[in-house]
Amino acid sequence: MTPQAILDKFGPREAMEYDVLIVGGGPGGLAAAIRIKQLAAAQNKEVSVVVLEKGSEPGAHILSGAVMDPKAMTELFPNWKELGAPLSQPVTGDDVYILTETGSFRTPNALVPNCMHNDGNYVISLGNVVRWMATQAEALGVEIFPGFSAAEVLYTEGGAVKGVATGNLGIEKSGAPGGGFQLGMELHSKYTVFAEGARGHLGKQLIAKFMLDANREPASYSIGIKELWEVPAAKAQPGKVVHTAGWPMDASTFGGGFLYHLADNKVALGFVRYTFALVVRTHVQLLSILQRIRCQNQWSY
């Protein structure tokens, strides 16, 4: 059965009304929800805010082991340290290496672009930061619905966005409703914020419908791989940040590598593009760190 046929047979869907609906419980979506509730409280207004998150919990689909500038966090929560935000590992060193097939050379700091300098930043697990932000959002009265993906954009008769519908549950491989079938619900709102991240499936629909990419440069994307390694204490350099360029890519290929020393003897190693991720591990610059250690997890993003 098609989704429309299922709706015709089992509908109408239950609908819930909110002032603001945010699709996506990542750092951007949660920051928007938190700020809206903060502004409403400052003006003594009641504004209902709901966040729809497809992951089983906030942070479940966050893959980045990132370097974070705390400026935005400070603007959102000036007392984030007292609140226990998981930004505990400041950057202690920052290097950019150009790799060749057999060696490497460190780029002098004076030649490194300002955007690549990480003084005052923190090496974090973004998943942990998102989970903490979700707790803060709920404390402010934000409703978070984890485990529900937005499947369809809903429009008014005039063509304006009025919300989204969640996907049906319990659909068999054939497309027919199964034993645990549950019809999706509609979330209506005065304002809908789409915070799906890059290449969100609803975002692509909206871009096409409203021609948001007309007369714009095409966006470009690359797939990368990140691995989490456990290193011996003697090799750990908590807070050390390393970025690489050059080998194994040629001069016409965009991409590069990163190596972030986290707390607890963990290292986040990644490379964009993913096709070079296994090759770059063999470089002498990385082998000096990766010898006799073990990989805990691997993600593509």
Predicted regions and their residues:
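N-terminal FAD cofactor-binding segment of flavoenzymes
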Residues: 46-103
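Extended hydrophobic secondary-structure segments that form protein cores and membrane-embedded regions
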Residues: 20, 48-56, 189-194
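Extreme N-terminal leader/targeting segments of oxidoreductases
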Residues: 1-21, 35-48, 98, 171
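Glycine-rich Rossmann-fold phosphate-binding loop(s) that bind the pyrophosphate
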Residues: 25-27, 54, 126
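Aromatic- and Gly/Pro-rich amphipathic surface segment
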Residues: 89-117, 121-122, 127
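Hydrophobic/small residue at the entry helix of a nucleotide-binding pocket
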Residues: 28, 32
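Predominantly flavin-linked oxidoreductase catalytic cores and closely associated redox partners
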Residues: 43-45, 127, 131, 136-299
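Short, solvent-exposed loop/turn and secondary-structure capping segments
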Residues: 61-63, 108-109, 204-207
